[in-house]
From Swiss-Prot:
Gene name of this polypeptide: fhs1
Assigned EC number: 6.3.4.3
Binding, ATP: T65, P66, A67, G68, E69, G70, K71, T72
SUPFAM superfamilies listed in its UniProt record: P-loop containing nucleoside triphosphate hydrolases
Domain of life: Bacteria
Family: Belongs to the formate--tetrahydrofolate ligase family.
NCBIfam families: PRK13505.1
Organism: Paracoccus denitrificans (strain Pd 1222)
Key words of the record: ATP-binding, Ligase, Nucleotide-binding, One-carbon metabolism
Protein name: Formate--tetrahydrofolate ligase
GO MF term list: ATP binding; formate-tetrahydrofolate ligase activity
Amino acid sequence: MKSDIQIAREAQKLPIAQIAGRLGLAEADFLPYGHDKAKIAHEAIAALAGRPQGRLILVTAINPTPAGEGKTTTTVGLGDALNRIGKRATVCIREASLGPNFGMKGGAAGGGHAQIVPMEDMNLHFTGDFHAVTSAHNLLAAMIDNHIHWGNALRIDPRRVTWRRVMDMNDRVLRQVVVALGGPANGVPRECGFDITVASEVMAILCLASDLADLQARLGRIVIGQTFDRRPVTAHDLGAEGAMTVLLRDALQPNLVQTLENNPALVHGGPFANIAHGCNSVMATRTALALSDYVVTEAGFGADLGAEKFLNIKCRLAGLQPAAAVLVATVRALKMNGGVARTDLGAENVAALRAGCANLGRHIQNLRRFGLPVVVAINHFSGDTEAEIAALADYCRERGVQAVLCRHWAEGGKGAEDLARAVVALAEGGADFTPLYPDEMPLAEKIETICHRIYGAGQVEFLPHIVERLEEWQAAGHGHLPVCMAKTQYSFSANPAALGAPEGFTIPVREVRLAAGAGFVVAICGDIMTMPGLPREPSALRIGVDADGHVQGLF
């Protein structure tokens, strides 16, 4: 079998103007970046207002395991399959971060014969959106220290500046640093640090903004720290939001590319799926809905994190109405949830699969809590046995959910046509989408609701200072905001080793953060790393350029 990058290089790509034409876009509606990438212009997006909307399909998954689930691959394969059965469908996914690409994750454009191209560009600099986010974020950081240096009229307390710097690379030594050493000319020394760009609130804002005006307003609401008398200081107080918006003006325009089967794909934005909402941009999703019958999108990690945030944060804030959910599962991952070691996953083990299906069952139940019809996509691996596939299908049938075997990795859209027909049937049957909690529910109660109803926790543990902080934000007018849970993606609990469907555990809320610009409150449960480090043998060791200038080892 050819590698992903070999398949991507052999793709018969169409000029991006033809892909835009399939969406009904004229030459003036997009800005080409070479022959195979483009940005859809602000003016073209504004002209789409009032158009009938297509149906929004969410692709999510069971809790991720090292065995792999193939969520992005399924998203792309489903988009191609919908087009094959006569529906105008567009795929919407996030952009890739350089850090994980050179660390240990690999690319983020699908796999096998269900990929988005140009794969190499997408996994490297693409159209420069992440550079723009990095620049806007660090401009604000520079303006904070510059303000303190030149007299500090706002009386910002250097000890309580919470705005860190960012870069799009994994570099553990930058997590905690001291800046402004070397004398008075270099500023006021203080502790600081770096996060990876996808952890920036600016990235979350870019992905939740509805237009340029909304982008600028959100940037102005960013809270960067406190004064000496504990009053919040915003980016607007520093006068930074205008210049930040200028840096992000082009980045706000969605990126148009294509699948291997020459169907349109909008790849835009990339917020962290733990301390942010982990979804592609509202601008891209709305644009696709106005230009397509069906829009297939995904949310980061498993349904307990990604789908919950997609539904409670993105859909709530953007007024989106999803029509159905596709829950991706693999025989291998379910056996792992049933207690099988990774090294033993190749052997048939129906009993372990049935035990691991408890994880799948809870995700099905949770998606139904939001009023969404669900179909399970069994992402096929060559080692899956007929008995294992039958047991998985039986489990789903007993719970009133259809399970569809998919072979899009090997066959492209053709291998997901049955899934596409099932999705169309579900979407045409209608959904009764409702967020899990109302806006007016107190912040602490929102956190408890997610922990009890989605995770299955028996208790939520708040440290005293966290309760005080939540009450303070509630009184300051932030109580209507949704909450963004930051915890391990590997388990329903805060313990990454607790696989399957644990119950009755305690979720410890260790820290809360106000993302006033993005428009949510982050609840951190356990240790969350916002600046990753490279592994002992990073992917970068295998990446290079051959004699013909072709990238080698990227994926």
